[in-house]
Amino acid sequence: MKIFARLFFTLLFMGHAMAQETPQTQLPRIALSAGIHQMDIQVALTPEQHQIGLMYRSEMPQNEGMLFVFQAPSKQCFWMKNTILPLTAAFVADDGSIVNLEDMKPQTTDSHCSLKPVRYVLEMNQGWFAKKGLKAGSKLAGRPFNN
């Protein structure tokens, strides 16, 4: 019986460890836009989804990203632990306006923070916002923004 219990807990632990190193790809999706630029966005709503974010992904299509939705506006800080892709984080106000943009280097624990309290953070491939001419003050449209 002891052997069975040890085997069970070993397999349980291994399954949990493996699940943590798998990219989350089955999150709900929404469409966002910035002027003429369309985005296909996965939405991370829970603390667990926030924690995993875009970790462990080796690629992401050009117009895809992830929107992190928090319960209330507050200072948001992100890092890139276990994240392979270089990303840009847009810290976004409730009305969809970009507060600030932060380029984030893969596999680092440097903090990248909003300049003021925000409820939303949109991560896209690094350089996506710059290539589209988007900067602080630019507006995003679509659910959940109030526009």
What does each model-identified segment do?
Residues 20-147:
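Compact, glycine-rich, soluble single-domain proteins
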